UniProtKB/Swiss-Prot annotation:
Organism of provenance: Neurospora crassa (strain ATCC 24698 / 74-OR23-1A / CBS 708.71 / DSM 1257 / FGSC 987)
Domain Clu residues, every copy: 331-575
Region annotation (Disordered) ranges: 1-50, 624-680, 913-945, 1257-1282
Name of the protein described by the UniProt record: Clustered mitochondria protein homolog
Location in or out of the cell: Cytoplasm
UniProt superkingdom: Eukaryota
CDD domains (alphabetical): CLU-central
Length: 1282
């Protein structure tokens, strides 16, 4: 089984590093310099870039601060390091001086003349401005723990939470018995998705907020007054404080009297820093602040750092609203934060997004320092914009932003908020009427943001894109774009607003030559062929890109590219295919994925090279060509994956050791081609071109015979691409899954990521499910079916939610989920709508109340038939895994639901409905809110048996269960090319046995990732994950453990507590800890990963086979042989269920189980299992195979040992009439109790053989580096050739 464990030990299989994509390999000769010169220059540059230490001299104290700095750093980074240091936390408004001269914050360290190791920089306090005073107040409040909880419309409840510290900290001294025991059949425990409740944090001060006297009147502003604050200390004293340009002082104000002058001595108190002032005002402040710091330091720092450059993950399951984890506390300053962050006029938060994007893009990128600064600025800018767009979209969806065209239809309305242009992802003006209307428009927006992301990643000089974000929220799709200068300008008579591409549909086509060079570069990178299109007058225009892609010359003189939803051709094979009756696809926007086009281009390139080699006679036709074809076939899928790994925005969490092996074989095949080419001059592939025409099959009508012939060829090329997808890519994926060459996806997200990497559109889920029927990938079929059902529910729910007011959405969601998942508890659910809300929203669409389980199923079945051309089997709704399906639909809709024991089926009497909330009859009488809550709570605590009337029949879900809905955001943020180049260079160096250089480059890549993205970001989590594997291969286990721990925490906070990436990171952490010797802690993390697996997938996921094997091996390392045996047995059960009994997988597991039984001193069963293993190996692999011979050798040894045990047993039975049972009965087979009764004697009878057996197993495990645990993933590897 492909699993995390395999990814951690590729070195054992002779694969030291993952494949380095050929595109990243540096040329041998750069700018005419030799390799030696480059090395010398690099060494000199490295010496110049060596970090050194400077001393910071602090004011008003004798303490100094030593800070390591790099010549590449900017001064403001040193400022940040000072602010974060414990002895300098009180400073925020200051500048640095060197030799008496002020240093500019935005220059590099190397630009400061004379600044070297040991130099002293003086920290000089600056006068405050109003903005600086506000920033200082916000920072001090957060620093001392005085800021309360924030209600966030975008991030959701408990956003960015981590449970890592609870896994071990919860019970650090747990007895080994608790670690060993595990209930394999227990249902998923959702409690593991919630952090443990802790007591309230110690308060260093009661409150600190803006005073009612704020803001200062004009007279006092002239005197330097900036803000007025009111502070209440733990001693119960209240102080009014003036924030002055020179610092903070206690004034004479009271709640009734305004007098902002300083208090006279001896009650006067003043300081430049508010933190220092608090120490003077409150005698207990320092002590309580220390306690607060100790409380905060209980968690890993990464678990508490602010999530900066990405939207934190919002868990789908959250605690009850009464939980202390989400308790809403009084905080006067919460409502003042808008002012504190944005100022009195709120101008601080108003930004010209488009100008910022394009100005950042135009920054120089000649040097490494330039690129670091540019990419860091872009990463921050994209993150800020995405966050602002998401917030604006939520307000638009809730109807809180006035439209610019209020008289238009709702779907056609447009909005501007916070300098971002918003529109709905619907066909409000009829643009997509011929393509499928609203459905086509919705898909086009998703494809557009993907196209913008690709263009941003390509980073073509002189070509600009607007900031683009797509937000799905409560059934609405909203597009947020930065405002391109001139986009709203009405064109002059005879002019077109669009300068390149289609204008007014396709009636007019513009082809401004100023756009041709930039579009040519873009087309080359995207594999788009230059082609002809015709306008309504049949006039020919030669375009570099799709006619749908538009070029606009902004009033700022920049060339903008818009409407990137058609960068690839249509999937004509899908459109022409006739599915089941009634399965007409809802739109014509069925484009191929860019990953597929790129993979096909690589395949065509390889075929071209092979043909050239054949033409030159370098390779022969029969044998060699056949082998080449095999290598090509082997490499097809991997090429897709390699290229997509470079372009995909998703973390590479599903990559495994088997994938890396496939990559290596691909690389070998490519190197053979290259070496062969060198024998007879280098093959010039510049003459080979592969590009597709994206406008075929879209209504273009060629005029001449030559044009018709060219169009026919273009159409054939696109058909070949469709054939490649269906006949090569999809079968290759299924074959890789069958052979366990890649990990099985765990849920909808990982399935989507896997298919997209391979270039497979999600509309092929039905085809994949059909092809998987009755094969060894049955669980893959089940996952495909689950994903289709979840997507169908999402689409049906969106239709009811789209035009519903926000307060009614909880009732709608509860009713739809009761019909979908709760019909087993109540087959006729009734929607519970608050009658007060019904009166308020009397014109709302209450059609969701008419939904029944039956018509909901029918609607979902139609969605699946239309979108996936797949027919669900009868009774599919009775086979649903309720928890897993609830998780899937919650994540797709952005729902955050309360944690409680949801009853999905009616039992004979009692427990499940206890947690449920009964539904009141409709219409229900209006009651006092508190009384209503009490009545509902009482009803939950009674048995459903007594609830005879319809009004008290329990429902699985009630509106109160839905805590929040968060927006689902798709952004266009590019990845850092610089950080990835350093990573690939480090991998390449290690692959070439330049370990020291490789490690330096890897550390440099890590530093770049952290600098550019910040510490808490999905890309950084992936970097930690990759680096932990590489360090493990290099034998640096401590570093591998630390990095994998960081990867797990950051993944939890950015991609989800129960994401597949998080599971993988915990499995790696477990394995690395075990290899380091911390098996007990390793077992805790492995158990957590398995518990997450149950929540995500349910029982019996194929990859858990390897994980259970690893767990068993860890148990053996702590001498828990009997418990280890149980894990091997469970692993074998799952393997037999997934792959069948007569397979190499099962034979390998039987081999390992036999060893475990021998260690558990169950000699007879050990012999039986080893014999089964031997017979399967012999049948499948032949008697001469190494696996077969090894199994035969062990069978002989175990048989000899069993005979000795049997003799000892007979002697004991003769001496004693009654044997004491040493262990509880094990497997229910004949003679088990007898064997159990003589375990103590067995050791004495054949002590030498058992000791050898233990030694053999443990040494084998150590020598193979965990190879034994990987058996199930590819058992052929155990003996080499299979």
């Amino acid at each position: 089984m492909a699993d995390a464990s395999q990814a951690t030990t590729p070195a054992a299989e002779g694969n030291p590093v993952p494949e380095v994509p050929e595109t990243q390999t540096p040329p041998a000769d750069v700018n005419g310099t030799t390799e030696q010169e480059q090395t010398e220059e690099g060494a000199e540059q490295a010496l110049e870039d060596q970090p050194f230490v400077v001393t910071i001299v602090l004011p008003n104290t004798t303490e100094t601060l030593d800070i390591p700095v790099s010549p590449m750093e900017q001064i403001h980074e040193i400022r940040q390091s000072i602010i974060e240091h414990p002895i300098a936390i009180e400073f925020s408004c200051f500048h640095l001086e060197f030799n008496g001269k002020k240093i500019n914050d935005f220059i590099q360290v190397s630009d400061v003349e004379g600044l070297e190791h040991g130099a002293q920089l003086h920290l000089v306090e600056d006068p405050y401005t109003e903005k600086e005073a506000r920033i200082h107040l916000i920072r001090i409040r957060e620093l001392i723990g005085a800021s309360g909880d924030r209600t966030d419309t975008v991030h959701g409840v408990l956003a960015g939470v981590s449970v890592h510290d609870d896994i071990v900290v919860e019970n650090p001294d747990a007895p080994e018995a608790e670690i060993k025991e595990y209930d394999f059949q227990a249902p998923a425990d959702l409690a593991i998705l919630l952090p443990k409740e802790t007591g309230p944090a110690p308060k260093s001060i009661k409150s600190i907020s803006l005073s009612p006297w704020n803001p200062p009147p004009a007279y006092w502003r002239q005197k330097g007054h900036l803000l007025y604050l009111v502070i209440q200390t733990n001693e119960g004293e209240q102080h009014h404080v003036t924030a002055h340009v020179g610092g903070f002082f206690v004034n004479r104000c009271s709640n009734a009297k305004f007098d902002p002058l300083p208090k006279p001595a001896p009650k006067d108190c003043a300081s430049h820093s508010l933190f220092t002032l608090l120490k003077k005002l409150s005698p207990s402040f320092e002590e309580s602040f220390k306690k607060f710091q100790e409380f905060s330091s209980q968690k890993d720092p990464l678990a508490t750092f602010q999530v900066g450059n990405t939207i934190p993950s919002a868990p789908w399951l959250v605690p009850s609203i009464n939980s202390s984890l989400i308790a809403h506390e009084a905080d006067n300053t919460r409502s003042q934060e808008t002012y504190l962050l944005g100022g009195a006029e709120n101008v601080d938060s108003l930004r010209d997004w488009n100008e910022e994007f394009q100005s950042a893009k135009e920054l120089p990128k000649e040097t490494i320092q330039d690129r670091v600064f540019r990419e860091r600025l872009l990463a921050k800018l994209f993150a800020d914009y995405t966050d602002a767009a998401a917030r604006g979209a939520v307000l638009v969806a809730r109807g809180e932003v006035a439209p610019l065209n209020p008289t238009e239809d709702k779907d056609a309305q447009i909005f501007v908020y916070n300098n971002i242009f918003f529109s709905f992802g619907a066909d409000g003006v009829g643009t997509f009427t011929s393509e499928g209307g609203d459905e086509a428009a919705r898909v086009a927006t998703g494809k557009d943001v993907l196209g913008v992301k690709l263009v941003n990643q390509l980073d073509i000089d002189g070509l600009y894109t607007p900031g683009t974000v797509v937000i799905d929220y409560l059934g609405k799709r909203i597009v947020g774009q930065s405002i391109v200068p001139g986009i709203f300008k009405q064109p002059e008579a005879g002019e077109n607003q669009i300068h390149y591409g289609a204008v007014d549909g396709k009636d007019i086509v513009a082809a401004d030559e100023r756009f041709a060079p930039s579009f040519e570069k873009l087309a080359t990178a995207l594999r788009v062929k230059k082609h002809a299109v015709w306008d309504k007058e049949n006039k020919r225009h030669d375009l570099e890109a799709s006619v749908e892609m538009k070029g606009l010359l902004g009033t700022d003189g920049r060339k903008y590219v818009l409407d990137l939803y058609r960068i690839t051709p249509l999937d004509i094979a899908w459109m022409e295919e006739s599915g089941p009756e009634g399965s007409e696809y809802p739109h014509r926007m069925t484009v191929l994925r860019p990953e597929l086009v790129e993979a096909l281009a690589k395949q065509k390139t390889r075929e071209y090279v092979q043909a050239e080699l054949l033409k030159r006679g370098i390779i022969k036709k029969p044998e060699e060509k056949k082998e080449g074809e095999e290598a090509t076939e082997e490499a097809k899928t991997e090429e897709i994956k390699t290229e997509e790994a470079e372009k995909s925005e998703e973390p590479k969490a599903e990559e495994t050791e088997k994938t890396e092996e496939a990559s290596e074989s691909t690389e070998v095949a490519e190197k053979k081609d290259e070496e062969a080419a060198k024998e007879d001059e280098r093959i010039d592939i510049s003459n080979f071109k592969f590009a597709l025409n994206p406008d075929v099959f879209s209504g273009q009508v060629p005029q001449t015979e030559e044009e018709k012939a060219e169009m026919a060829q273009d159409e054939q090329d696109v058909r070949d691409a469709c054939t490649y997808l269906r006949d090569s890519v999809i079968p290759a994926l299924l074959n890789d899954l069958k052979e366990s060459d890649i990990s099985f996806p765990m849920d909808g997200r990982s399935l989507t990521r896997l298919l997209h990497r391979r270039g497979i559109n999600m509309r092929y889920l039905g085809k994949l499910a059909t092809l998987s029927e009755g094969t060894r990938v049955e669980c893959f079929r089940q996952l495909c079916v689950r994903e289709m059902i979840a997507r169908a529910f999402k689409h049906v729910a969106a239709k009811y939610l789209r035009y519903l007011p926000l307060p009614l959405t909880s009732a709608c969601l509860a009713h739809l989920l009761n019909c979908f998942l709760g019909f087993g508890l109540n087959s006729s659910p009734v929607a519970e709508v608050d009658e007060e809300l019904r009166k308020v929203f009397s014109d709302a669409d209450y059609s969701f109340e008419q939904v029944t389980p039956e018509n909901l199923r029918e609607a979902m079945q139609q969605e699946i038939l239309h979108r996936f051309r797949f027919t669900l089997e009868d009774g599919w709704y009775n086979q649903l895994q309720h928890v897993q399906m609830l998780r899937e639909v919650s994540q797709k809709l952005g729902v955050q639901i309360q944690n409680k024991k949801y009853a999905f089926v009616a039992t004979e009497g009692e427990a499940e409905p206890v947690a449920e909330k009964p539904v009141a009859p409709a219409p229900a009488p209006v009651e006092d809110g508190n009384k209503k809550k009490k009545k509902k709570k009482a009803a939950r605590e009674t048995s459903p048996v007594a609830a005879a009337p319809v009004a008290t029949v329990p429902h699985t879900f009630s509106p109160d269960d839905f805590v929040n809905v968060v927006p689902i955001v798709k952004d266009s943020t590019p990845r850092s090319a610089l950080a990835e180049e350093a990573l690939e260079a480090g991998r390449l160096s290690i692959y070439q046995n330049q370990k020291k250089l490789g490690e330096d480059l890897l550390l440099e890549s890590l530093s770049l990732h952290e600098q550019i993205y910040g510490l808490v970001h999905p890309e950084v989590a992936q970097m930690y994950h990759t680096l932990s594997q590489l360090y493990y291969q290099l034998g640096q286990k401590d570093a591998a453990v630390e990095l994998s721990r960081k990867a797990a925490i950051v993944a939890e906070r950015t991609v989800g507590l129960d994401s597949s990436e998080t599971v993988l990171n915990y499995l790696n952490l477990s394995l690395f800890l075990h290899q380091r010797g911390d098996s007990k802690e390793a077992l805790l993390y492995a158990r957590h990963a398995l518990d997450l697996w149950k929540v995500i997938y349910g029982p019996d996921h194929p990859d858990t086979i390897t994980t259970m094997n690893n767990y068993a091996v860890m148990l053996q390392s702590i001498k828990a042989y009997h418990e280890s045996r149980r894990w091997f047995e469970e692993s074998l059960r799952v393997c037999n269920k997934v792959f069948g009994e007569q397979t190499v997988h099962s034979a390998t597991l039987l081999f390992q189980l036999a060893q475990a039984l021998a260690l558990d001193q169950d000699a007879k069963k050990a012999v039986d299992r080893m014999r089964e293993s031997y017979n399967i190996f012999k049948t499948l692999l032949g008697p001469e195979d190494k696996n077969t011979k090894e199994a035969e050798h062990w069978l002989t040894q175990l048989t000899h040992n069993a005979v000795s045990v049997a003799k000892a047993t007979k002697e004991l039975q003769a001496r004693r009439a009654k044997g004491s049972l040493g262990f509880s009965p094990r497997n229910a087979t004949a003679g088990a109790a007898g064997i159990g009764s003589v375990v103590p004697s067995a050791v004495g009878v054949d002590n030498r053989n058992i000791d050898e057996l233990v030694k053999f197993v443990e040494n084998s495990e150590k020598k193979k580096g965990g190879k034994k645990s990987k058996g199930p993933s590819n058992p052929k590897k155990r003996g080499g050739k299979a």
